[in-house]
């Protein structure tokens, strides 16, 4: 988090207006402007563990990672700066949560890239904080309003559910494949061998569907799941519970909080971080896997066929196999052998 995003650059055009404000930053926080903007006081709330890590190093306890913000997270704030995400239900969850806590009269700024659909903020907040567009630059829009009425927020009403081959999948706004199993994960699942045993790590677990599907035909595996997303962590816990599957689930920036070694690491790694394309997580996953695989253990991932992962796999493991593919996706397999770099 060094260079500012276009949304932050638009905010910086108005930096003089924020010098006396006590600001809560929230939403799709992709840089460290919350720690660097000159304000009377700044807090930040994020549902993304990796962004929380960066901001906590600079803001200490004034930056917090969690699914739901609390009264303590908004304490003494008179201004909200909300970065609009690419996912509208995610924005609604977060904004209804935050506006239910902030006092009437709070200044509300919403900023985001036009392609993210930020203009729909006007309609979403019309009954609570009517917005007007106050700036347009860097293909972004900046909207301002004042909180006139607090919404009633009930996190339980945002839960969703769908079924995959008799399995129940619990979801929340912001979780990958919230409305159904994606094609890439389907392809990866088709390669998993029944009656597998050992310790399995599911990185970027989303709603937990890969793990529960694997556990159904391999009940002796011991599951660990992790994700950067607070909604994903909670959704995975709920999915495991709904299917009577045991496993440990926690927030982690790829391997940052992972301890120990595993017999298998599975993943459908993301290649977007908010609105931005990013291969960092997948490359960190591949390179770091050798520090978390037992000898003979394997990394198995699915990815869009056009993404440049074969070179990283070969560089790290010495070789790789493509064990399934379609026109759009490939499932890669790499084995932990003496050829692998020990990291």
From Swiss-Prot:
Keywords: Cytoplasm, Methyltransferase, rRNA processing, S-adenosyl-L-methionine, Transferase. It is found in: Cytoplasm. SUPFAM superfamilies: S-adenosyl-L-methionine-dependent methyltransferases. This is Ribosomal RNA small subunit methyltransferase C. Its EC number is 2.1.1.172. Belongs to the methyltransferase superfamily. RsmC family. Gene3D superfamilies: Vaccinia Virus protein VP39. Monomer. PANTHER family: RIBOSOMAL RNA SMALL SUBUNIT METHYLTRANSFERASE C (PTHR47816:SF4). One of its GO terms (cellular component) is cytoplasm. It catalyses: guanosine(1207) in 16S rRNA + S-adenosyl-L-methionine = N(2)-methylguanosine(1207) in 16S rRNA + S-adenosyl-L-homocysteine + H(+). The keyword Cytoplasm applies. It comes from Shigella boydii serotype 18 (strain CDC 3083-94 / BS512).
């Amino acid at each position: 988090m060094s260079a500012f995003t276009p949304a932050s650059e638009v905010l910086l055009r108005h930096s003089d207006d924020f010098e006396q404000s006590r600001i809560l930053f929230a939403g799709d926080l992709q840089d460290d402007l919350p720690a660097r903007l000159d304000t009377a006081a700044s807090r930040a709330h994020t549902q993304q563990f990796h962004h929380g890590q960066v901001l906590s190093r600079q803001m200490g306890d004034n930056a917090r990672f969690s699914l739901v913000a609390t009264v303590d997270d908004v304490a003494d704030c008179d201004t909200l700066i909300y970065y609009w995400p690419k996912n509208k239900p995610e924005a609604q969850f977060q904004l209804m949560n935050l506006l239910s806590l902030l006092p009437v009269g709070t200044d509300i700024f919403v900023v985001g890239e036009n392609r993210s659909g930020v203009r729909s903020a006007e309609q979403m907040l019309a009954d609570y904080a009517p917005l007007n567009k106050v700036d347009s630059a860097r293909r972004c829009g900046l909207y301002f309003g004042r909180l006139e009425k607090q919404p009633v927020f009930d996190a339980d009403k945002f839960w969703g559910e769908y079924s995959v081959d008799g399995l129940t999948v619990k979801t929340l706004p912001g979780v990958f494949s919230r409305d159904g199993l994606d094609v890439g994960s389907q392809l990866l699942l088709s390669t998993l061998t029944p009656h597998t045993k050992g310790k399995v790590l599911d990185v970027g677990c989303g709603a937990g569907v890969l793990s529960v599907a694997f556990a159904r035909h391999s009940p002796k595996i011991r599951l660990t799941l992790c994700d950067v997303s607070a909604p994903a962590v909670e959704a995975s816990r709920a999915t495991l519970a709904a299917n009577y599957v045991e496993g440990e689930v926690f927030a982690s920036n790829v391997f940052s909080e992972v301890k120990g070694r595993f017999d298998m690491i599975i993943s459908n790694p993301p290649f977007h971080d908010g609105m931005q394309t990013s291969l960092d997580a997948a490359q960190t996953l591949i390179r770091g896997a050798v520090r978390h695989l037992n000898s003979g253990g394997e990394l198995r991932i699915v990815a869009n066929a056009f993404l440049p992962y074969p070179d990283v796999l070969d560089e790290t493991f010495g070789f790789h196999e493509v064990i399934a593919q379609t026109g759009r996706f490939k499932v890669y397999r790499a084995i932990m052998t003496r050829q692998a770099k020990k990291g």
